[in-house]
Protein backbone atom coordinates (compact mmCIF):
# COMPACT_ATOMS: atom_id res chain seq x y z
CA UNK A 1 0.00 0.00 0.00
CA UNK A 2 1.34 3.40 -0.95
CA UNK A 3 1.33 6.22 1.58
CA UNK A 4 -2.27 6.87 2.53
CA UNK A 5 -3.61 10.04 0.94
CA UNK A 6 -5.94 12.38 2.77
CA UNK A 7 -9.45 13.32 1.75
CA UNK A 8 -8.27 16.73 0.57
CA UNK A 9 -5.34 15.32 -1.42
CA UNK A 10 -7.52 12.84 -3.27
CA UNK A 11 -10.22 15.42 -3.93
CA UNK A 12 -7.67 17.91 -5.30
CA UNK A 13 -6.20 15.27 -7.63
CA UNK A 14 -9.62 14.31 -8.93
CA UNK A 15 -10.70 17.92 -9.31
CA UNK A 16 -7.67 18.49 -11.54
CA UNK A 17 -8.93 15.66 -13.77
CA UNK A 18 -12.58 16.66 -13.58
CA UNK A 19 -12.75 20.45 -13.03
CA UNK A 20 -16.55 20.53 -12.82
CA UNK A 21 -16.55 17.91 -10.05
CA UNK A 22 -18.18 15.24 -12.21
CA UNK A 23 -16.93 12.60 -14.62
CA UNK A 24 -18.25 12.57 -18.17
CA UNK A 25 -20.74 9.96 -17.06
CA UNK A 26 -22.01 12.14 -14.24
CA UNK A 27 -20.25 10.44 -11.32
CA UNK A 28 -19.33 12.81 -8.48
CA UNK A 29 -15.67 13.04 -7.55
CA UNK A 30 -16.77 12.99 -3.90
CA UNK A 31 -18.08 9.47 -4.45
CA UNK A 32 -14.78 8.43 -6.03
CA UNK A 33 -12.91 9.85 -3.04
CA UNK A 34 -15.09 7.79 -0.72
CA UNK A 35 -14.55 4.54 -2.62
CA UNK A 36 -10.80 5.03 -2.74
CA UNK A 37 -10.51 5.81 0.96
CA UNK A 38 -12.69 2.82 1.81
CA UNK A 39 -10.39 0.45 -0.09
CA UNK A 40 -6.74 1.52 0.28
CA UNK A 41 -5.23 -1.91 -0.47
CA UNK A 42 -4.76 -2.96 -4.08
CA UNK A 43 -4.52 -6.65 -3.15
CA UNK A 44 -4.14 -8.91 -0.15
CA UNK A 45 -0.44 -9.14 -0.95
CA UNK A 46 -0.42 -5.41 -0.29
CA UNK A 47 -2.03 -6.22 3.08
CA UNK A 48 0.72 -8.76 3.86
CA UNK A 49 3.45 -6.20 3.18
CA UNK A 50 1.79 -3.53 5.31
CA UNK A 51 1.02 -5.86 8.22
CA UNK A 52 4.56 -7.29 8.21
CA UNK A 53 5.82 -3.75 8.83
CA UNK A 54 3.30 -3.34 11.65
CA UNK A 55 4.47 -6.56 13.24
CA UNK A 56 8.15 -5.62 12.95
CA UNK A 57 7.44 -2.28 14.62
CA UNK A 58 5.59 -4.07 17.43
CA UNK A 59 8.52 -6.46 17.92
CA UNK A 60 10.90 -3.50 18.21
CA UNK A 61 8.57 -1.84 20.72
CA UNK A 62 8.51 -5.04 22.79
CA UNK A 63 12.32 -5.16 22.80
CA UNK A 64 12.26 -1.73 24.43
CA UNK A 65 9.41 -2.48 26.84
CA UNK A 66 8.17 -6.00 27.61
CA UNK A 67 4.87 -4.53 28.75
CA UNK A 68 4.08 -3.92 25.08
CA UNK A 69 3.39 -7.54 24.23
CA UNK A 70 0.76 -8.33 21.61
CA UNK A 71 -2.28 -10.61 21.74
CA UNK A 72 -4.64 -12.54 19.50
CA UNK A 73 -7.57 -14.91 19.58
CA UNK A 74 -7.89 -17.83 17.18
CA UNK A 75 -10.75 -17.22 14.74
CA UNK A 76 -12.37 -19.80 12.48
CA UNK A 77 -14.31 -17.37 10.30
CA UNK A 78 -13.94 -13.87 8.96
CA UNK A 79 -16.92 -12.78 11.04
CA UNK A 80 -15.28 -13.96 14.28
CA UNK A 81 -12.14 -12.00 13.41
CA UNK A 82 -14.15 -8.92 12.49
CA UNK A 83 -16.15 -8.95 15.73
CA UNK A 84 -13.01 -9.51 17.81
CA UNK A 85 -11.23 -6.51 16.30
CA UNK A 86 -14.35 -4.35 16.57
CA UNK A 87 -14.58 -5.26 20.25
CA UNK A 88 -10.91 -4.39 20.81
CA UNK A 89 -11.36 -1.05 19.08
CA UNK A 90 -14.47 -0.30 21.13
CA UNK A 91 -12.64 -1.21 24.34
CA UNK A 92 -9.26 0.43 23.74
CA UNK A 93 -10.03 3.02 21.10
CA UNK A 94 -7.34 1.41 18.93
CA UNK A 95 -6.47 -1.93 17.35
CA UNK A 96 -2.82 -1.52 18.29
CA UNK A 97 -1.31 -4.73 19.65
CA UNK A 98 -4.25 -6.92 18.60
CA UNK A 99 -3.74 -9.60 15.93
CA UNK A 100 -5.75 -12.49 14.51
CA UNK A 101 -4.55 -16.06 14.97
CA UNK A 102 -5.44 -18.62 12.32
CA UNK A 103 -5.41 -22.04 13.94
CA UNK A 104 -4.71 -25.15 11.89
CA UNK A 105 -6.65 -27.07 14.54
CA UNK A 106 -9.81 -25.08 13.83
CA UNK A 107 -9.34 -25.33 10.06
CA UNK A 108 -9.17 -29.11 10.50
CA UNK A 109 -12.01 -29.22 12.98
CA UNK A 110 -14.40 -26.72 11.41
CA UNK A 111 -13.37 -25.41 8.00
CA UNK A 112 -12.80 -28.31 5.64
CA UNK A 113 -15.01 -30.27 3.26
CA UNK A 114 -14.56 -33.59 5.04
CA UNK A 115 -16.34 -32.73 8.26
CA UNK A 116 -14.83 -32.35 11.71
CA UNK A 117 -11.29 -33.73 11.55
CA UNK A 118 -8.51 -33.98 14.16
CA UNK A 119 -5.47 -31.72 13.94
CA UNK A 120 -3.37 -34.15 11.90
CA UNK A 121 -2.95 -32.32 8.55
CA UNK A 122 -5.73 -34.43 7.06
CA UNK A 123 -7.72 -31.51 5.66
CA UNK A 124 -7.22 -29.94 2.25
CA UNK A 125 -4.44 -27.36 2.42
CA UNK A 126 -6.39 -24.80 0.39
CA UNK A 127 -8.75 -24.39 3.37
CA UNK A 128 -6.04 -22.44 5.18
CA UNK A 129 -5.57 -20.04 2.28
CA UNK A 130 -9.32 -19.59 1.91
CA UNK A 131 -9.71 -18.66 5.57
CA UNK A 132 -6.91 -16.07 5.46
CA UNK A 133 -8.58 -14.42 2.48
CA UNK A 134 -11.99 -14.57 4.15
CA UNK A 135 -10.68 -12.92 7.31
CA UNK A 136 -9.20 -10.01 5.41
CA UNK A 137 -12.35 -9.59 3.31
CA UNK A 138 -14.29 -9.29 6.58
CA UNK A 139 -11.84 -6.88 8.20
CA UNK A 140 -11.76 -4.69 5.10
CA UNK A 141 -15.55 -4.67 4.93
CA UNK A 142 -15.64 -3.47 8.53
CA UNK A 143 -13.60 -0.49 7.33
CA UNK A 144 -15.96 0.12 4.43
CA UNK A 145 -19.04 0.06 6.66
CA UNK A 146 -17.53 2.39 9.26
CA UNK A 147 -16.18 4.85 6.68
CA UNK A 148 -19.48 4.80 4.80
CA UNK A 149 -21.17 5.92 8.01
CA UNK A 150 -18.71 8.81 8.28
CA UNK A 151 -19.23 9.84 4.66
CA UNK A 152 -23.01 9.72 5.14
CA UNK A 153 -22.55 11.94 8.19
CA UNK A 154 -20.56 14.36 6.03
CA UNK A 155 -23.22 14.38 3.30
CA UNK A 156 -25.98 15.01 5.85
CA UNK A 157 -23.99 17.84 7.42
CA UNK A 158 -23.50 19.53 4.06
CA UNK A 159 -27.14 19.02 3.10
CA UNK A 160 -28.21 20.72 6.32
CA UNK A 161 -25.88 23.68 5.71
CA UNK A 162 -23.34 22.87 8.42
CA UNK A 163 -20.38 25.20 8.89
CA UNK A 164 -17.05 24.51 7.21
CA UNK A 165 -15.60 23.86 10.65
CA UNK A 166 -18.19 21.17 11.36
CA UNK A 167 -17.54 19.52 7.99
CA UNK A 168 -13.77 19.69 8.49
CA UNK A 169 -14.18 17.92 11.83
CA UNK A 170 -15.88 15.00 10.09
CA UNK A 171 -13.22 14.98 7.36
CA UNK A 172 -10.58 14.89 10.09
CA UNK A 173 -12.21 11.75 11.51
CA UNK A 174 -12.22 10.22 8.04
CA UNK A 175 -8.51 10.97 7.59
CA UNK A 176 -7.71 9.69 11.08
CA UNK A 177 -9.75 6.51 10.78
CA UNK A 178 -7.87 3.48 12.09
CA UNK A 179 -8.33 0.36 10.00
CA UNK A 180 -9.66 -2.91 11.35
CA UNK A 181 -6.99 -4.67 9.27
CA UNK A 182 -4.39 -6.20 11.62
CA UNK A 183 -1.65 -8.84 11.30
CA UNK A 184 -2.57 -12.51 11.01
CA UNK A 185 -0.35 -15.23 12.44
CA UNK A 186 -1.18 -18.16 10.16
CA UNK A 187 -0.58 -21.82 11.01
CA UNK A 188 0.99 -23.78 8.14
CA UNK A 189 1.21 -26.91 10.32
CA UNK A 190 4.34 -28.89 9.34
CA UNK A 191 4.25 -27.61 5.76
CA UNK A 192 1.86 -30.16 4.23
CA UNK A 193 4.60 -32.08 2.45
CA UNK A 194 8.21 -31.61 1.40
CA UNK A 195 10.15 -28.35 1.19
CA UNK A 196 8.74 -27.46 -2.22
CA UNK A 197 5.18 -28.15 -1.08
CA UNK A 198 5.81 -25.93 1.95
CA UNK A 199 7.08 -23.13 -0.28
CA UNK A 200 4.11 -23.36 -2.66
CA UNK A 201 1.58 -23.29 0.18
CA UNK A 202 3.45 -20.48 1.94
CA UNK A 203 3.23 -18.37 -1.23
CA UNK A 204 -0.52 -18.83 -1.46
CA UNK A 205 -0.97 -17.96 2.22
CA UNK A 206 1.10 -14.81 1.78
CA UNK A 207 -0.80 -13.80 -1.35
CA UNK A 208 -4.00 -14.21 0.68
CA UNK A 209 -2.63 -11.67 3.18
CA UNK A 210 -0.55 -13.55 5.77
CA UNK A 211 2.40 -11.52 7.03
CA UNK A 212 3.44 -14.18 9.54
CA UNK A 213 3.73 -17.95 9.10
CA UNK A 214 3.98 -20.42 11.98
CA UNK A 215 5.53 -23.80 11.15
CA UNK A 216 6.29 -26.74 13.45
CA UNK A 217 9.04 -29.35 13.57
CA UNK A 218 6.82 -32.40 13.37
CA UNK A 219 6.83 -34.92 10.55
CA UNK A 220 4.28 -33.69 8.03
CA UNK A 221 2.60 -37.02 7.32
CA UNK A 222 2.51 -38.04 10.99
CA UNK A 223 1.54 -34.65 12.43
CA UNK A 224 -0.42 -34.50 15.70
CA UNK A 225 -1.97 -31.70 17.68
CA UNK A 226 0.72 -30.22 19.93
CA UNK A 227 -1.17 -31.37 23.02
CA UNK A 228 -1.62 -34.99 21.97
CA UNK A 229 0.65 -37.98 22.34
CA UNK A 230 2.52 -39.71 19.52
CA UNK A 231 4.35 -36.66 18.21
CA UNK A 232 7.24 -37.32 15.82
CA UNK A 233 9.86 -34.65 15.13
CA UNK A 234 12.12 -34.18 12.13
CA UNK A 235 15.92 -33.70 12.26
CA UNK A 236 16.95 -30.06 12.64
CA UNK A 237 18.42 -29.71 9.16
CA UNK A 238 15.09 -30.88 7.71
CA UNK A 239 13.23 -28.24 9.72
CA UNK A 240 15.68 -25.52 8.76
CA UNK A 241 15.03 -26.34 5.11
CA UNK A 242 11.31 -25.76 5.69
CA UNK A 243 12.07 -22.43 7.37
CA UNK A 244 14.12 -21.46 4.33
CA UNK A 245 11.21 -22.42 2.09
CA UNK A 246 8.97 -19.99 3.99
CA UNK A 247 11.59 -17.24 3.79
CA UNK A 248 11.99 -17.72 0.04
CA UNK A 249 8.22 -17.40 -0.37
CA UNK A 250 8.26 -14.06 1.46
CA UNK A 251 11.26 -12.81 -0.51
CA UNK A 252 9.90 -13.84 -3.89
CA UNK A 253 6.67 -11.94 -3.24
CA UNK A 254 8.44 -8.84 -1.99
CA UNK A 255 7.30 -9.13 1.62
CA UNK A 256 10.69 -8.11 2.97
CA UNK A 257 9.51 -7.88 6.58
CA UNK A 258 7.67 -11.22 6.58
CA UNK A 259 7.75 -12.93 9.98
CA UNK A 260 8.41 -16.63 10.59
CA UNK A 261 7.51 -18.40 13.83
CA UNK A 262 9.43 -21.65 14.40
CA UNK A 263 7.49 -23.95 16.69
CA UNK A 264 9.13 -26.84 18.51
CA UNK A 265 7.08 -29.75 19.79
CA UNK A 266 10.11 -31.52 21.23
CA UNK A 267 9.11 -31.06 24.86
CA UNK A 268 6.33 -33.61 24.42
CA UNK A 269 7.67 -35.51 21.41
CA UNK A 270 9.36 -38.81 22.18
CA UNK A 271 9.90 -40.08 18.63
CA UNK A 272 11.78 -39.34 15.43
CA UNK A 273 11.12 -40.79 12.00
CA UNK A 274 14.71 -40.99 10.86
CA UNK A 275 18.30 -40.84 12.05
CA UNK A 276 20.11 -38.07 10.18
CA UNK A 277 23.59 -38.53 8.75
CA UNK A 278 26.31 -36.77 10.74
CA UNK A 279 29.24 -35.40 8.74
CA UNK A 280 31.28 -34.21 11.69
CA UNK A 281 31.11 -33.94 15.44
CA UNK A 282 28.90 -31.11 16.65
CA UNK A 283 26.81 -30.74 13.50
CA UNK A 284 23.00 -30.71 13.55
CA UNK A 285 22.77 -34.45 12.98
CA UNK A 286 25.13 -35.40 15.79
CA UNK A 287 23.43 -33.04 18.26
CA UNK A 288 20.09 -34.63 17.33
CA UNK A 289 21.29 -38.24 17.43
CA UNK A 290 22.88 -37.90 20.86
CA UNK A 291 19.43 -37.83 22.48
CA UNK A 292 18.32 -41.16 21.00
CA UNK A 293 17.39 -43.95 23.34
CA UNK A 294 19.96 -46.71 22.79
CA UNK A 295 21.23 -49.87 24.38
CA UNK A 296 24.76 -51.28 24.27
CA UNK A 297 25.64 -54.06 21.85
CA UNK A 298 27.45 -56.83 23.71
CA UNK A 299 28.14 -60.51 23.37
CA UNK A 300 25.11 -61.10 25.55
CA UNK A 301 23.04 -58.60 23.55
CA UNK A 302 24.23 -58.87 19.93
CA UNK A 303 22.71 -57.34 16.82
CA UNK A 304 20.04 -59.42 15.13
CA UNK A 305 19.27 -59.67 11.43
CA UNK A 306 17.91 -56.36 10.10
CA UNK A 307 18.77 -54.32 13.20
CA UNK A 308 20.67 -51.02 13.13
CA UNK A 309 23.69 -49.81 15.04
CA UNK A 310 25.21 -46.34 15.46
CA UNK A 311 28.65 -45.34 16.69
CA UNK A 312 28.41 -43.28 19.88
CA UNK A 313 31.16 -42.30 22.30
CA UNK A 314 33.57 -44.89 20.96
CA UNK A 315 31.12 -47.79 20.94
CA UNK A 316 28.38 -49.25 18.81
CA UNK A 317 24.88 -48.90 20.23
CA UNK A 318 21.47 -50.09 19.11
CA UNK A 319 18.86 -47.29 18.76
CA UNK A 320 15.54 -48.37 20.20
CA UNK A 321 13.12 -48.79 17.33
CA UNK A 322 9.35 -49.05 17.68
CA UNK A 323 7.31 -51.71 15.83
CA UNK A 324 6.29 -48.99 13.33
CA UNK A 325 9.94 -48.20 12.56
CA UNK A 326 10.11 -44.94 14.52
CA UNK A 327 13.02 -44.28 16.88
CA UNK A 328 12.69 -43.23 20.51
CA UNK A 329 14.40 -40.41 22.37
CA UNK A 330 15.62 -40.88 25.92
CA UNK A 331 13.14 -39.87 28.57
CA UNK A 332 13.77 -36.49 30.16
CA UNK A 333 15.59 -35.03 27.14
CA UNK A 334 12.73 -32.90 25.82
CA UNK A 335 13.83 -29.70 27.52
CA UNK A 336 17.37 -29.92 26.15
CA UNK A 337 16.08 -30.70 22.67
CA UNK A 338 13.74 -27.69 22.81
CA UNK A 339 16.62 -25.37 23.65
CA UNK A 340 18.73 -26.73 20.80
CA UNK A 341 15.76 -26.54 18.40
CA UNK A 342 15.14 -22.89 19.20
CA UNK A 343 18.77 -21.83 18.91
CA UNK A 344 19.13 -23.61 15.56
CA UNK A 345 15.89 -22.11 14.21
CA UNK A 346 16.88 -18.57 15.17
CA UNK A 347 20.56 -18.70 14.24
CA UNK A 348 20.51 -20.97 11.19
CA UNK A 349 16.88 -21.06 10.05
CA UNK A 350 16.27 -17.30 9.87
CA UNK A 351 13.22 -17.61 12.13
CA UNK A 352 12.11 -14.41 13.81
CA UNK A 353 10.12 -15.84 16.71
CA UNK A 354 9.97 -19.18 18.48
CA UNK A 355 7.06 -21.14 19.89
CA UNK A 356 7.59 -23.74 22.61
CA UNK A 357 4.61 -26.07 22.94
CA UNK A 358 4.22 -26.98 26.62
CA UNK A 359 1.95 -29.34 28.52
CA UNK A 360 1.14 -26.97 31.38
CA UNK A 361 1.03 -23.17 31.76
CA UNK A 362 4.09 -22.64 33.94
CA UNK A 363 5.94 -19.32 33.75
CA UNK A 364 8.99 -20.66 35.59
CA UNK A 365 9.38 -23.58 33.16
CA UNK A 366 9.23 -21.37 30.06
CA UNK A 367 11.45 -18.70 31.61
CA UNK A 368 14.16 -21.23 32.45
CA UNK A 369 14.30 -22.50 28.86
CA UNK A 370 14.32 -19.00 27.41
CA UNK A 371 17.20 -18.05 29.71
CA UNK A 372 19.26 -20.86 28.16
CA UNK A 373 18.26 -19.88 24.62
CA UNK A 374 19.18 -16.24 25.24
CA UNK A 375 22.72 -17.24 26.15
CA UNK A 376 23.11 -17.92 22.42
CA UNK A 377 20.46 -15.55 21.01
CA UNK A 378 20.08 -12.58 23.39
CA UNK A 379 17.04 -11.07 21.66
CA UNK A 380 15.07 -14.32 21.32
CA UNK A 381 11.32 -13.70 21.49
CA UNK A 382 8.42 -16.11 21.79
CA UNK A 383 4.87 -16.68 20.71
CA UNK A 384 3.06 -18.49 23.53
CA UNK A 385 0.01 -20.68 23.20
CA UNK A 386 -2.31 -19.96 26.13
CA UNK A 387 -4.00 -23.18 25.15
CA UNK A 388 -7.56 -24.31 25.92
CA UNK A 389 -5.98 -27.79 26.12
CA UNK A 390 -4.76 -26.77 29.58
CA UNK A 391 -7.15 -27.00 32.51
CA UNK A 392 -6.23 -23.49 33.61
CA UNK A 393 -8.27 -23.47 36.80
CA UNK A 394 -6.80 -26.75 38.01
CA UNK A 395 -3.23 -25.95 36.96
CA UNK A 396 -3.09 -22.55 38.62
CA UNK A 397 -4.78 -23.78 41.81
CA UNK A 398 -2.33 -26.68 42.02
CA UNK A 399 0.58 -24.27 41.55
CA UNK A 400 -0.68 -22.02 44.35
CA UNK A 401 -1.32 -24.99 46.64
CA UNK A 402 2.15 -26.43 46.07
CA UNK A 403 3.83 -23.07 46.65
CA UNK A 404 1.88 -22.32 49.81
CA UNK A 405 2.62 -25.78 51.24
CA UNK A 406 6.35 -25.34 50.54
CA UNK A 407 6.27 -21.91 52.19
CA UNK A 408 4.45 -23.29 55.23
CA UNK A 409 1.46 -21.03 54.63
CA UNK A 410 -0.98 -23.96 54.56
CA UNK A 411 -0.96 -27.64 55.44
CA UNK A 412 -1.56 -30.32 52.82
CA UNK A 413 -4.92 -31.12 54.41
CA UNK A 414 -6.20 -27.56 54.01
CA UNK A 415 -6.95 -28.00 50.32
CA UNK A 416 -7.39 -31.24 48.36
CA UNK A 417 -4.98 -32.40 45.70
CA UNK A 418 -5.96 -33.26 42.14
CA UNK A 419 -9.25 -32.58 40.39
CA UNK A 420 -11.10 -31.93 43.65
CA UNK A 421 -9.58 -28.44 43.49
CA UNK A 422 -11.94 -27.73 40.57
CA UNK A 423 -14.94 -27.64 42.90
CA UNK A 424 -16.93 -24.40 42.80
CA UNK A 425 -16.63 -24.20 46.59
CA UNK A 426 -13.04 -23.03 46.10
CA UNK A 427 -13.95 -20.22 43.67
CA UNK A 428 -14.22 -17.70 46.50
CA UNK A 429 -11.59 -19.27 48.76
CA UNK A 430 -8.28 -17.55 49.42
CA UNK A 431 -6.53 -20.08 47.19
CA UNK A 432 -9.12 -19.68 44.43
CA UNK A 433 -8.82 -15.90 44.48
CA UNK A 434 -5.02 -16.09 44.38
CA UNK A 435 -5.14 -18.47 41.42
CA UNK A 436 -7.51 -16.11 39.59
CA UNK A 437 -5.21 -13.17 40.31
CA UNK A 438 -2.34 -15.15 38.77
CA UNK A 439 -4.50 -15.94 35.74
CA UNK A 440 -5.19 -12.24 35.32
CA UNK A 441 -1.46 -11.52 35.54
CA UNK A 442 -0.23 -14.58 33.62
CA UNK A 443 0.41 -12.92 30.26
CA UNK A 444 2.08 -9.92 31.86
CA UNK A 445 4.38 -12.19 33.86
CA UNK A 446 5.30 -14.54 31.03
CA UNK A 447 6.01 -11.60 28.72
CA UNK A 448 8.24 -9.90 31.29
CA UNK A 449 10.06 -13.01 32.49
CA UNK A 450 10.06 -15.38 29.53
CA UNK A 451 10.42 -13.21 26.45
CA UNK A 452 6.88 -13.74 25.19
CA UNK A 453 6.18 -11.09 22.55
CA UNK A 454 2.83 -12.52 21.53
CA UNK A 455 0.18 -14.24 23.64
CA UNK A 456 -2.54 -16.12 21.84
CA UNK A 457 -5.41 -18.48 22.56
CA UNK A 458 -5.68 -21.01 19.77
CA UNK A 459 -9.29 -22.22 19.98
CA UNK A 460 -11.41 -19.69 21.89
CA UNK A 461 -14.04 -19.19 19.20
CA UNK A 462 -14.55 -22.96 18.94
CA UNK A 463 -15.34 -23.15 22.65
CA UNK A 464 -17.23 -19.85 22.69
CA UNK A 465 -19.52 -21.03 19.89
CA UNK A 466 -20.17 -24.29 21.75
CA UNK A 467 -20.88 -22.53 25.06
CA UNK A 468 -23.06 -19.71 23.73
CA UNK A 469 -25.06 -22.06 21.50
CA UNK A 470 -25.60 -24.41 24.44
CA UNK A 471 -26.66 -21.52 26.65
CA UNK A 472 -29.20 -20.19 24.15
CA UNK A 473 -30.52 -23.65 23.26
CA UNK A 474 -30.95 -24.59 26.91
CA UNK A 475 -33.20 -21.59 27.51
CA UNK A 476 -34.96 -21.39 24.15
CA UNK A 477 -35.97 -25.04 24.01
CA UNK A 478 -36.69 -24.93 27.73
CA UNK A 479 -39.15 -22.76 29.62
CA UNK A 480 -37.76 -19.32 28.72
CA UNK A 481 -38.29 -19.59 24.95
CA UNK A 482 -37.97 -16.08 23.44
CA UNK A 483 -36.79 -14.63 26.73
CA UNK A 484 -33.68 -16.79 26.42
CA UNK A 485 -32.73 -15.09 23.13
CA UNK A 486 -33.64 -11.60 24.25
CA UNK A 487 -31.98 -11.82 27.67
CA UNK A 488 -28.79 -13.64 26.68
CA UNK A 489 -28.24 -12.15 23.22
CA UNK A 490 -30.18 -9.12 22.04
CA UNK A 491 -30.27 -7.04 25.24
CA UNK A 492 -26.58 -7.68 25.76
CA UNK A 493 -25.79 -6.59 22.19
CA UNK A 494 -27.73 -3.36 22.68
CA UNK A 495 -26.32 -2.54 26.11
CA UNK A 496 -22.73 -3.38 25.11
CA UNK A 497 -23.02 -1.32 21.90
CA UNK A 498 -22.24 -4.34 19.74
CA UNK A 499 -22.83 -3.13 16.20
CA UNK A 500 -23.97 -6.56 15.00
CA UNK A 501 -27.33 -5.99 16.70
CA UNK A 502 -28.09 -4.04 13.50
CA UNK A 503 -27.36 -7.11 11.44
CA UNK A 504 -28.43 -5.65 8.08
CA UNK A 505 -26.06 -2.72 8.54
CA UNK A 506 -23.31 -5.03 9.77
CA UNK A 507 -23.19 -7.00 6.54
CA UNK A 508 -23.20 -3.94 4.29
CA UNK A 509 -26.81 -3.10 3.48
CA UNK A 510 -26.08 0.62 3.88
CA UNK A 511 -23.04 0.21 1.63
CA UNK A 512 -25.36 -1.04 -1.06
CA UNK A 513 -27.71 1.92 -0.61
CA UNK A 514 -24.80 4.34 -0.86
CA UNK A 515 -23.55 2.78 -4.07
CA UNK A 516 -27.02 2.81 -5.59
CA UNK A 517 -27.18 6.54 -4.86
CA UNK A 518 -23.77 7.04 -6.46
CA UNK A 519 -24.91 5.56 -9.78
CA UNK A 520 -28.69 6.15 -9.72
CA UNK A 521 -29.21 9.29 -7.67
CA UNK A 522 -32.87 9.85 -6.81
CA UNK A 523 -33.83 6.74 -8.78
CA UNK A 524 -32.04 4.48 -6.29
CA UNK A 525 -34.19 1.76 -4.73
CA UNK A 526 -32.83 1.64 -1.20
CA UNK A 527 -33.27 -0.88 1.60
CA UNK A 528 -32.69 1.54 4.45
CA UNK A 529 -35.92 3.49 4.33
CA UNK A 530 -38.42 4.34 7.04
CA UNK A 531 -39.90 0.85 7.07
CA UNK A 532 -36.60 -0.93 7.69
CA UNK A 533 -36.93 -2.65 11.08
CA UNK A 534 -33.26 -1.94 11.81
CA UNK A 535 -34.43 1.58 12.70
CA UNK A 536 -35.67 0.07 15.97
CA UNK A 537 -32.00 -0.27 16.95
CA UNK A 538 -30.93 3.26 16.06
CA UNK A 539 -28.60 4.83 18.61
CA UNK A 540 -30.43 6.94 21.16
Curated annotation (Swiss-Prot):
Can also use Mn(2+). SUPFAM superfamilies: Phosphoenolpyruvate/pyruvate domain. Optimum temperature is 45 degrees Celsius. Loss of activity is 0%, 16%, 30%, 82% and 100% when incubated at 25, 30, 40, 50 and 60 degrees Celsius for 30 minutes, respectively. One of its GO terms (biological process) is glyoxylate cycle. CDD domains: ICL_PEPM (cd00377). Keywords: Glyoxylate bypass, Lyase, Magnesium, Manganese, Metal-binding, Tricarboxylic acid cycle. InterPro entries: ICL/PEPM (IPR039556), Isocitrate_lyase (IPR006254), Pyrv/PenolPyrv_kinase-like_dom (IPR015813), Pyrv_kinase-like_dom_sf (IPR040442). In the presence of magnesium, inhibited by oxalate, potassium cyanide, manganese, silver, cadmium and to a lesser extent by succinate, glycolate, iodoacetamide, DL-penicillamine, aluminum, sodium, potassium, lithium and strontium. Transmembrane segments: none annotated. Coiled coil: none annotated. Homotetramer. Belongs to the isocitrate lyase/PEP mutase superfamily. Isocitrate lyase family. This is Isocitrate lyase. The gene is aceA.
Amino acid sequence: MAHKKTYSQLRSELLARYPVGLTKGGVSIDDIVQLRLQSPYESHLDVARAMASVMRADMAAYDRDTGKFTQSLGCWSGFHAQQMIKAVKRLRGTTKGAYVYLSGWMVAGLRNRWGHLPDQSMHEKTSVVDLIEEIYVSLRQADEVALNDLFNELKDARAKGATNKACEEIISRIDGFESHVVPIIADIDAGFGNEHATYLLAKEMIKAGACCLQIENQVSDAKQCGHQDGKVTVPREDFIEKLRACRLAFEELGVDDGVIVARTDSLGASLTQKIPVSQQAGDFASSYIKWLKTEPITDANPLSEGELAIWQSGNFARPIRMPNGLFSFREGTGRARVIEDCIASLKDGDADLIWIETDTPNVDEIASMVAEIRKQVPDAKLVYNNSPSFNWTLNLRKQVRAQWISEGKIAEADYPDGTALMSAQYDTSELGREADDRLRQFQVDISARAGVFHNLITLPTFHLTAKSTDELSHGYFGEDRMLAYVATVQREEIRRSISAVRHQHEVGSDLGDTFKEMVSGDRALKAGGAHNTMNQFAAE
